A protein has these predicted regions:
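Helix-loop "lid/cap" segments that line or gate small-molecule binding pockets
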Residues: 29-30, 50-63, 119, 151-152
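Conserved donor sugar-nucleotide recognition element shared by glycan-biosynthetic enzymes
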Residues: 22, 51, 87, 144
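Residue-level detector of conserved catalytic or cofactor/ligand-binding positions
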Residues: 159-169
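Metal-dependent phosphoesterase signature
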Residues: 56-93
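Substrate-recognition "cap/lid" segment bordering the active-site pocket of phosphatases
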Residues: 114-160
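Active-site neighborhood of HAD-like aspartate-dependent phosphohydrolases
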Residues: 2-45, 59
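Short, acidic loop-to-helix structural element flanking the phosphoryl-transfer center
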Residues: 79-107, 113-117, 145
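Glycine-rich phosphate-binding loop signature in dinucleotide/nucleotide-binding domains
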Residues: 2, 101-103, 155-159
């Protein structure tokens, strides 16, 4: 029997290897705006945080440029970037074991919820989750402090564990 009944999984870097598609989408947005590319070698700087924050902090864009960068990013990501995604080896077995033990599972990602839905479907694990929880276009849910309570509400649970890639020191 599992210690926990509810599990929240991050998507990028936890369930799926998505760094290349995210980087390509980010590079495309920056180049499309005629801006110089920052050093994107450290993917932990831009995989995980909300997109608006990435454009502000990594690219040093102002508010208007950041909003436009997010639009361009999402257009590219929707047609190309999300396809450059693969399930980490063994994660499907882990999800199946948890599900078979009676646990409730949710994706809890700062990625736009529609993309999280589509990606879990593309990866063949969508049906293993009781809820797919992601950010909104209007910014009402954009980071983990907004998303975790939303996921807990969707699952109807209180005793849970959040599984994600390690945070940077």
């Amino acid at each position: 029997m599992n210690k926990y009944k509810y599990y929240l999984f991050d998507l990028d870097g936890t369930i799926s290897e998505s760094a290349l598609g995210i980087r390509e989408s980010l590079e495309n947005a920056i180049k499309s705006m005629g801006k110089p590319l920052p050093n994107l070698d450290d993917y932990t700087l831009y995989i995980g945080p909300p997109l608006l924050d990435t454009f502000r902090n990594i690219c040093r864009f102002n508010e208007e440029e950041s909003a436009r960068g997010v639009e361009i990013y999402r257009e590219y990501y929707n047609t190309k970037g999300k396809l450059v995604n693969k399930l980490y080896d063994g994660i499907d077995r882990v999800l199946a074991e948890l599900k078979n033990s009676g646990a409730k599972l949710a994706v809890c990602s700062s990625k736009y919820e529609k993309f999280a839905e589509e990606i879990t479907d593309l990866l063949g694990v969508h049906d293993m989750f009781d809820a797919i929880c992601g950010s909104t276009l209007d910014g009402s849910r954009k980071d983990k402090k907004d998303l975790i309570p939303y996921a807990v509400e969707r699952l109807g649970g209180l005793s849970l564990i959040h599984i994600s890639e390690p945070t940077r020191p």
